[in-house]
Amino acid sequence: MKRTNRRAFLATTVTGTAALVAGALGRADDAKPQTSLAALILAGGQMAMAQARYAAMARQADADGYGQAASLFRAAARSKEANVTDLGAVIKKLGGKLECDAKPGEVKSTKENVAALIKAETEAGETTLPELVAVAREEKNKEAVRALNYAKAAAAEYATLFAEAAADLEAWKAGKKSVYVCTVCGFPAYTLPEKKCPTCFDALDKFTQVS
């Protein structure tokens, strides 16, 4: 196979893989990646699915009367959007392409959705993404390690924020809640950091307010 044809073949394969993993949230034991590119594709599919799912959960929270929880769900969706953009850019540099037909999946009551998000983000931050980082680190792919670590850090933050919400969910009914989201790495905060993003160290003008 000629080199140019091989690159086209690989790009097509990666695109197909993205479609297969787009529905994943959490571990994917039957599809453990062996390369940085495959790890990025898997993570990108997961992030795209989470983005769609959390946006749908935000709408459900609004319908259930949990305005502040809806704001946090919207922030989570915005963070995943940032992660998808970042991961997709690194995938492109490696000659791949991220194409995901992400659907929200099952959306239940707000209480159940909060619990589902905590479980998914905890698993992503503590297990799935660290495993993918290890794959990228083995190949010494610094860009892949960086992008995956950004996604991992954001997942850990949301697991904590939603655990706090779950502890007193009834208090999250009144009004909206402002969340500042870094559009580079997805880091969320209720108040702007003093000088720069604590995860990616970008300037504060990279933050967007979500409510």
Segments and roles (model prediction):
Residues 2-5, 10-21, 28-211:
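Non-heme di-metal
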